[in-house]
From Swiss-Prot:
Keywords: ATP-binding, Cytoplasm, Nucleotide-binding, RNA-binding, Thiamine biosynthesis, Transferase, tRNA-binding
GO cellular component, one term: cytosol
Subcellular compartments: Cytoplasm
Gene: thiI
Occurrences of domain THUMP (ranges): 60-165
Matching Pfam families: ThiI, ThiI_fer, THUMP
Annotated function: Catalyzes the ATP-dependent transfer of a sulfur to tRNA to produce 4-thiouridine in position 8 of tRNAs, which functions as a near-UV photosensor. Also catalyzes the transfer of sulfur to the sulfur carrier protein ThiS, forming ThiS-thiocarboxylate. This is a step in the synthesis of thiazole, in the thiamine biosynthesis pathway. The sulfur is donated as persulfide by IscS.
Protein name: Probable tRNA sulfurtransferase
KW tRNA-binding (keyword) present: yes
Amino acid sequence: MDYSEIMVRHGELSTKGKNRMRFINKLKNNIQDVLAPFPAITVRSDRDRTHVSLNGTDYQPIVEALKLVFGVQALSPVYKLEKSVPLLVTAVQDIMTSLYRDGLTFKIATKRSDHAFELDSRELNSLLGGAVFEVLPNIQAQMKHPDVTLKVEIRDEAAYISYEEIKGAGGLPVGTSGKGMLMLSGGIDSPVAGYLALKRGLDIEVVHFASPPYTSPGALAKAQDLTRRLTRFGGNIQFIEVPFTEIQEEIKNKAPEAYLMTLTRRFMMRITDAIREQRKGLVIVNGESLGQVASQTLESMQAINAVTSTPIIRPVVTMDKLEIIEMAQAIDTFDISIQPFEDCCTIFAPDRPKTNPKLGNAEKYEERFDIDGLVQRAVSGIVVTEITPEIVNDEVENLIDALL
């Protein structure tokens, strides 16, 4: 027998009361986005489950994709069949025969939500257990901690049989907690911050600053590859490329070296906030970790934050670098993050950046700039690209291949 579908069990969604179906429908849409590379797949949801019909598609890559989607508590490959006692008996016998080995223990666990079905749960457990003994007389039944728990569900539309329960990613479906702008540089920390924001249901749009010719096409492709990795957790992501060359050259030419980083980050924050307002986001997310670098001391954060009243979420702020690296490796962004492409935060980095910049000094130096004009030109020059989970070679790999 081949699996018919993957049955998805919802996580925290069961606690959402009147909003439950809104959360479930969002999860369904996210699953459809993530599984877009598999055109034969169909997805439907009810209040208790989401059903991913395989329609002949190999189940293993579907399971691997679904395990990453936030809002999924658990999933099971299942056999779907008509609600017929003879069909159930044959299916249970075939499945257990395929799983049998010496010493194997099992139990049948039946759940009947269709109360019009001819047998109740207790009767089905007895009948199907007896059917297993008919073909496997040496198998042992065990009610506590058996090797195999064969779950049989009798629902209104069909019967379902499964024996695997695979842990999902948990969290909330992406998009159920509003929208935020993720400042993604291309380093290790910001993709991890994005992952953690996605886990709590935040719909992120990625803001990436590019300063050609100081930053290369490879740096841009790297940021897009990182964004593509994040689409595995909740579907498509809007990637916003911000032209930043003019501003960086202005800062380099007119500001004291010690304040280059502070002023650069203040402009980035202003621009991100303007994009957030334009695109109806609610928060800004970044990968700052307290004390990790000069721009991430409390004094620096205070001086940079002063340009906006928008909430700033810093998911990795209390994490050690090694903890962030471990998470980056777990979500498969680390190898991309360490590719040796420059970013806007490093190209004009001073040898001795100010670790305790004074807000008054930053504001005084900014009097040398046409702040509104610079921000407006940057925002008007953004390029928005929708990044999807399609199975393609990484952009950076394509670029390297082209060069070779």
